Amino acid sequence: MTLRFGVIGTGAIGREHMKRIENKLSGGKIVAVTDMNQEAAKQVVTQMKLEADVYPDDRSLVAADNVDAVLVTSWGPAHEANVLAAIEAGKYVFVEKPLATTAEGCMKIIKAEMNHGKRLVQVGFMRRYDKGYVQLKKAIDDHFIGEPLMVRCAHRNPEVGESYIDDMAIHDTLIHEIDVLHWLIDDEYESVSVSFPKKTKHALPHLRDPRVVTLETKGGVLITAEVFVNCKYGYDIQCEVIREEGIASLPEVDSISFRKRATLGTNILMDWKQRFIEAYDVELQHFIDSIKQSGEPSGPNAWDGYVAAITADAALKASNSGQKQFISLKEKPAFYSVKKENAHEAML
């Protein structure tokens, strides 16, 4: 069985996923494409030599008889409508973050999927598929160094451009930590606060950088997440879980060490694509394989997208108010409580 994809959005991430499905992964094929810029969509089909039709809009693409699964890589505010259309048509859907730009939008998707009666949606939280995070998750789940007490992590970028506004530090950057930490320690968030140290001289006037986000879980785990998007030295992701009997840390990226002029060092990546390229491959292959094997995706689901949205909204309020914000989630439906094969179980 080949899973036939229709792609909504042919920007940078959309093109990368299309190349991935056509050239690197097994079991998938691009058969339909659409974009607000029709010429761009046609150009992609021509350049990649795809056997795919270009549709005038997302609705017509979703309705196409030869589309089994919809890949949503459109503009963030369009995701909600794209996903709801796919669910209405009974099509599987892989959607890049965010699932929706509001918690209310996420809830609409959750209700639509539950009414359909089976899982159709997977959200593109790719860090769960990163080899290092997978190893860290296994170490945590094995409990061989006790229960988690604290987590320290950092998300550092060399620099950002003028289009990067202050809110993006939460909704575009911290959002990755919000999801992966929720998955790593398997505990619900209770509150969030944000503090701002001295501002770096490299930050543009409109941006507060760096910032430290403190999350507390219902189980009492205290998480500090540094967001520093103008650190200059490289793209650096850190995570350290302090346990009752030891510490588990995210492995460093593989790199040769060098000795030169009385210096011993290693290279640091400058780009997120290099850091997580394999994780993108694994998450989409897992999406394809899960559907072929069980008839449902088993990766990050619509509920995970809702948790991320609620938590990010609270973190943004904390950033702007200077006050701790409590995180109030609706009760998790049993529909999303059934254990599926997780990425780390499939990879280890």
Swiss-Prot record:
Pfam families listed in its UniProt record: GFO_IDH_MocA, GFO_IDH_MocA_C
**NAD as UniProt keyword:** yes
- Pathway recorded for this protein: Polyol metabolism; myo-inositol degradation into acetyl-CoA; acetyl-CoA from myo-inositol: step 1/7
What Enzyme Commission number(s) does the record list for this chain? 1.1.1.18, 1.1.1.369
Could you provide one GO biological process annotation from this protein's UniProt record? inositol catabolic process
Subunit field text = Homotetramer.
Task: Report the protein's function.
Answer: Involved in the oxidation of myo-inositol (MI) and D-chiro-inositol (DCI) to 2-keto-myo-inositol (2KMI or 2-inosose) and 1-keto-D-chiro-inositol (1KDCI), respectively.
Q: Which family does it belong to?
A: Belongs to the Gfo/Idh/MocA family.
Q: What is this protein called?
A: Inositol 2-dehydrogenase/D-chiro-inositol 3-dehydrogenase
